[in-house]
């Protein structure tokens, strides 16, 4: 059973899943596959692959970062809820907000949260560029993004939402270091400073991952993020 595999792998890292948490992951998988038949949530649907490449991959940052306590976490472009929903299951005190530009994914997440009995979660249908200019600007302890765009672009979408003293966690595949060199200029302009990078392998040769931890040192200039689409079309790079 894939849930037993996940439980065993997390136990090796000192994380013990309760029966309730195991049931939540099992329901999560079931709902993901059901809803995926009517909307494109993920290309990964094999049970073991979901447990490895979505659930385990989402939780792995917690091997290097402390998510305990009532921290506020905003997840940008989480799709079907990765990494924030698996993290919320393992760390129930987290206060999670997911911002996604596709309303159908928000509908799935609302249904998922109700079925899993998750509290202190909210799902916002919005563009990150607009959300980052609103009332929740510079209000989150942690902002996460998992491989949704290059780091230069992600920094402009995510750092404006991180409060001073908080952190942006960029979760990347093996090209993270290369992207980091390109993004250093943008990170600095946006008030951030790279703290550290953790590189690790997923089990079963499923690929290399990198977590880049960026401290929010200063407030972000009010001109960022720029209007929707601009960060992607014209990334902040040194001229």
Swiss-Prot record:
Chain sites annotated for binding S-adenosyl-L-methionine: 77, 82, 128-129, 146
Keywords linked to the UniProt accession: Cytoplasm, Methyltransferase, rRNA processing, S-adenosyl-L-methionine, Transferase
Cell location: Cytoplasm
UniProt family annotation: Belongs to the methyltransferase superfamily. RNA methyltransferase RsmG family.
Protein known as: Ribosomal RNA small subunit methyltransferase G
Alphabetized HAMAP family for the sequence: 16SrRNA_methyltr_G (MF_00074)
Function comment: Specifically methylates the N7 position of guanine in position 535 of 16S rRNA.
Molecular-function annotations in GO: rRNA (guanine-N7-)-methyltransferase activity
EC identifiers of the protein: 2.1.1.-
EC supergroup of this enzyme: transferase
Cellular compartments per GO CC: cytosol
Membrane keyword on record: no
Presence of the UniProt keyword Methyltransferase in the record: yes
Stretch list, region Disordered: 216-239
Originating gene: rsmG
Coiled-coil parts of chain: none
One Pfam family recorded for the sequence: GidB
Domain of life: Bacteria
